[in-house]
Design a protein with these regions (language model features):
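Ordered, amphipathic secondary-structure segments that act as subunit-interaction surfaces
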Residues: 1-29
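C-terminal cap of thioredoxin/glutaredoxin-like
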Residues: 31, 35-140
């Protein structure tokens, strides 16, 4: 499976380096950091891209607070506030609620896209799958 994903990434300019990944981190803190970025007016998408790059390209431990804070500051977030966001636990309830909702929807991994709250697309799918799902959602 990793070879398939790595090959797909090459075509899209994403150099997956699965051999660099030494740990499967707990991502609760990372999700909390994304919520902080959303609420602080930062770019959650830039943060998410940086987190994915750190993990899948560099093999960094994105469960480590210092790593998360460095990544946050790299994308322009305030380091002190980012650290407080992940260490304080103030976003934990929201993260857990999101995880419960994901479980309710049958989400077991990423990527997973939910359209219109009703249609789930699991895994790396071709564009045609998304087009078909969007057409279906619009038609109903």
């Amino acid at each position: 499976m990793f070879a398939h994903v790595a090959n797909a990434g090459v075509g899209d300019g994403i150099p997956f380096q699965f051999d660099r990944i030494a740990t499967a981190p707990n991502t609760v803190r990372g999700h909390a950091l994304v919520l902080y970025a959303q609420q602080s007016g930062g770019s959650p998408w830039a943060l998410i891209e940086a987190l994915f790059s750190a993990y899948f390209e560099q093999g960094e431990d994105i469960g480590d607070v210092d790593t998360l804070v460095r990544i946050a500051t790299d994308v322009g977030l305030d380091g002190v506030e980012a650290r407080a966001a992940v260490e304080s636990g103030r976003f934990d309830v929201d993260v857990m609620q999101s995880q419960r909702e994901a479980a309710r929807l049958g989400i077991r991994g990423v990527p997973f896209v939910v359209l219109d709250g009703r249609y789930g697309i699991s895994g790396a799918q071709p564009v045609e799958v998304f087009e078909q799902a969007i057409r279906r959602a619009l038609a109903e």
